[in-house]
Amino acid sequence: MSHGTAAVSIHRLPDDPGRRQVARRIAHVSGPVLWAAAFATLVALAIYLRTLMPATGFWDTAEAQTVPPTLSIFHPTGFPTYTVLGWLWSQLPIGGVAYRMNLLSAVSVACAAGLTVLITSHFITERSRWLVAAASGVAGLAFAFASEPWENALRADVHAIHIGLAATIVWLVVTWRTAEQVGSPHPGRWLAAAALVFGLSMGNHPLTGLMAFAIGPWLFIVDPGIWRRWRLILACAALLVVGLLVYLYIPIRANISPEPPLFYARPTTWEGFRYLVFAEQFHGLFDQFANPLDFLAGKWDKAESVLAAQLVGPGWLVVAMGAATLAVRRLGAFAFLGLLVVSNIFYAMNFEDGDIDRYYLLSTLVACVLIGVAAAALAGGGARAVAEATRRTLDFAGRRRAASIAGAIVIGLAALLPAVALATRYEVRDQSDNREADLWVTSVYRALPQDAVIISWWSYSTPLWYHRWVLGDRPDITIIDERNIIDDGWSTIDAAIRGHLGRRPVFLVPPDWEVERLLSVFRTRPVATYGGYTELVEVLP
């Protein structure tokens, strides 16, 4: 008898009726897998806490640190789920508000690592519970210390919450499949929960919508007759709508006095709401979708460079092995994960965002799931081979020990992927001393005279806002962002400068693309501030 046949299968229901009911209720989540998920979550969180940005950031980071605690309005698409969740989280008595919002990202990505463990366990066909748990744990840690997840875990950003919610959706729909297969009571509840989370996740980031291209086919892979289950379909549709109702935050908040400190696009009307939620400002970023296959080689080169950076060493070779294994053993699951990746990469390749790397988080999660599948298959195959090879030389107990050692060696080798990633990326990813934005804002505020107007652009406006509206610094000054000039009625930077020049001191952090023109149109003098960033200038009458 080989080690493989000696092990108890977690995919086989026990004969005892009472134990069968327990197995149905937990939908095949074994104790070792739960421990592995908890371990991956806690290890990831511990490392994230050691490397977490402690303070304010530039760009979208400071906006994500400012909007929730002040109950303001985000840039398109509004991200109301993040706002509401962030406001609740910002009430925690832990550090400063900026730190709390950064911590929210760390917790979300760490939870995604734990969910990666649970997801992976559903796709592994090996019988040993401990092997499933160990291989799934490797998958979770591989995700935790992949390049983009780790980077996004250290700063406030909607994408960190997105991957946590996306992982939750994937886990719920694959658990629904298992619950259906084993005859768990009320398996549709898992799918209904996924629908609710899907709606809420759309309120965090519409990137969630791409998951429908995989979830739709998955429903019919699991149950070809699901279209007849109209009660379940209606329940899921209703819960999806309930989740989407989070978007009501935007018009409600926009029409409550006093108006929010950050009031992007002033969505007090249907036109303003539509402009914000449907990202009409950014329609130009979608131009590539008119001809998505144009310049495909160049687009793929960029996507490949992002994806290649996520894993270390032979990581992608192991991913390919996992994909091949899953395609042979569970073609439907392979199709589901493949559609998640294809839709994600296709969109990211054609969308021109300032930090497009964040959009590949879900593809990275799927890749790490496949690492776990490959590790389990290799370990299980190795264990069976050793058990067979020692059939004539060892007794049953000896063969089992030898097989276990062989499997453990393979898992240990697979664990080198996250271990090497942790060791080699720690210094690069460490943001624990990053207080650059705070130092810059402090120097700027120190340089501004009483009642000054400062006209800035997005990367710099956001930390200025945080210090003004969250910390209460310099209530005498007016901060005008080069985009929000439109909402404030100035139309252009030039008009805003001329509207205040001679009445109030005017200072400018010129946008990179406007520096030369603005400095040639207006008389200015440089103002000394914290170095290394765009120069602050005073506009002279």
Question: What feature does the model see in each segment?
Answer:
Residues 67-70, 139-141, 186-204, 214-216:
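Membrane-interface alpha helices of multi-pass inner-membrane proteins
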Residues 177-178, 183, 210-241:
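Perimembrane helix-loop-helix junctions
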